[in-house]
Each structure stands twice: as C-alpha cells, then as structure tokens.
Amino acid sequence: MTDNTVWHETLHDQFGQYFAVDNVLYHEKTDHQDLIIFENAAFGRVMALDGVVQTTERDEFIYHEMMTHVPLLAHGHAKHVLIIGGGDGAMLREVSRHKSIETITMVEIDAGVVSFCRQYLPNHNAGSYDDPRFTLVIDDGVNFVNQSHQTFDVIISDCTDPIGPGATLFTSSFYEGCKRCLNPGGIFVAQNGVCFLQQDEAIDSHRKLSHYFGDVSFYQAAIPTYYGGIMTFAWATDNDVLRHLSTEIIAARFHQTHLKCRYYNPAVHTAAFALPQYLQDALSPKEVS
C-alpha cells in the first residue's frame, strides 16, 4: 500500500466501498491481524483490520456514543464496566465521561492495536488511557469472561466482524461467559453489523443470546463508515423494563451526567429500539416487541 492510491474494503464479495489513500501512517501485520491506518480527505484517519474498516475520525462518535450511553443510561446506576475489544480507545473515552463509573476494565487480545492507536488515533482515546479508573487486560475476551472473578454492571463488546479472531466473540461460549460476569440487572451490548446485509449475524446472535438472557433485542444507528445501511447493536439483559424506559426518564438521567454529545440524545435513545419490519420478521414477531 502506497500513498495516493485507492484502498478497497473486502467485507463483501459482490459490492463494497473504497477510500482514497492520501497518506499511509501505518501498515503491518500483527500477530493477530493485518492492520492499516491511513489518512483520507473526507473521513480523516481511517483504521482497517483484515480488509474491513473499523473506525474513522469523521464519524466514530456516532458508533461510540451509541454503544456506551444507551446501556449506561438505561441501567441508571452502573459502577463497573467491561469493554471487550476497543483497542482504539474511543469506547473507553465515552465510558470515562460518566463520572459515576468506578472501574473500567478493557480486554484487548492484541497489545499492538492499543499501541498503534495511541500513536496514530490520539483523538479517539483523547487521553482516556490515563484515567485512574481504567485497567487494561491483554487477553482473549472469551477466556476472560469465562475465567474472571470480577463482575460488571454493563459489558460492551466492541468486536470486529465474525471473521478471524473476532469470530469467537459471537459464540455461545462468549455470551455465556458474559452472563456469568454480569451483576443482576446488568446489560450486555455488542456491535452486530449492518443488518440489511448481515442479517444472518443478527439472527444468530439473537438465537444464542436468548439462551442466557430474558430480554434480547437490538437497537440501531446510522453510521456512514459502515457500508450498506443502519448499524445494528445487540442488546441483552434480564430486566425487560430497561429497554422500554420513557424518553423523560432517560432525559432526566442524561441531564444529571452533564454530557454533551454529537449524536446521542434521549429521543435518539428511545427511537433506536424501533426496528425495521424486515428485521422483526426475520427474528419472528413473537420474539420482538
């Protein structure tokens, strides 16, 4: 890969997207993944793993705000948060904005990703790696949730697509481990791809998660970087009230945090759980309300 070329995403065989590469900042295969970080005039710095875009400076705030503030504000009194993946540091950045959080644990399989991102994506982590509440664990996420003695109020799986090393974070073993690590009333969320193009992933996750959690559904956000439509996030908890909280309740909690967001707001929070009919039909009407 050289400067002034075009980088093509390889997630889909029959269609896809490309980025003009203005400047390659880093490109090397780590022990686990093929990682590249380059600059693009429209999206800023772009990071891709194994031919799939993971994040861009231009729109990462949408993904990370929705992955953090939705479960944290729905929970209402979370103190201990676990992030699986998230090596770019942006998920940590958003969680750390909640001053009521007491501990933030991040489990990343590849120490190299953390090092690269601290150097090349500083706006993503915005200094959050230095938060005294933060602990970094270099380990496989499945192993951690099945072996750890720690428990958490919210678990955020900032996983890659279910290919390569990221595939293990879509298995029953991982979901079962997350359930054992959650405190009563806890919430698990995970990225689940663009459901219009990756519907089988949502169906598979829904089926597996339903073995361990009483309330399983999805919520969504429109993120331009992720080609093909609206991004889907898995939602799992045993407290079915949390998914149906009113906008007024969420707004009161949001006001108490003094957060200023660029995408998330209480109305977006409640609207995000309204799923398109094709996804409801795929999951079956009896399973989604």
UniProtKB/Swiss-Prot annotation:
Enzyme Commission code: 2.5.1.16
Residues holding S-methyl-5'-thioadenosine: Q33, E108, D140, G141, P165
Compartmental location: Cytoplasm
Highest taxon, organism lineage: Bacteria
Residue span, PABS domain: 5-238
Pfam family, one: Spermine_synt_N
Pathway(s) annotated for this protein in UniProt: Amine and polyamine biosynthesis; spermidine biosynthesis; spermidine from putrescine: step 1/1
InterPro entries noted in UniProt: PABS, PABS_CS, SAM-dependent_MTases_sf, Spermi_synthase, Spermidine_synt_N, Spermidine_synt_N_sf
Catalyzed chemical reaction(s): S-adenosyl 3-(methylsulfanyl)propylamine + putrescine = S-methyl-5'-thioadenosine + spermidine + H(+)
Record: active site: D158
A molecular function GO annotation: spermidine synthase activity
GO biological process: spermidine biosynthetic process
A GO cellular component entry from the record: cytosol
List of residues binding spermidine: H64, D88, D158, C159, T160, D161
Entry keyword set: Cytoplasm, Polyamine biosynthesis, Spermidine biosynthesis, Transferase
Subunit-structure text: Homodimer or homotetramer.
Function: Catalyzes the irreversible transfer of a propylamine group from the amino donor S-adenosylmethioninamine (decarboxy-AdoMet) to putrescine (1,4-diaminobutane) to yield spermidine.
Protein name (database record): Polyamine aminopropyltransferase
Organism: Enterobacter sp. (strain 638)
Upper classification of the organism: Bacteria, Pseudomonadati, Pseudomonadota, Gammaproteobacteria, Enterobacterales
Underlying gene: speE
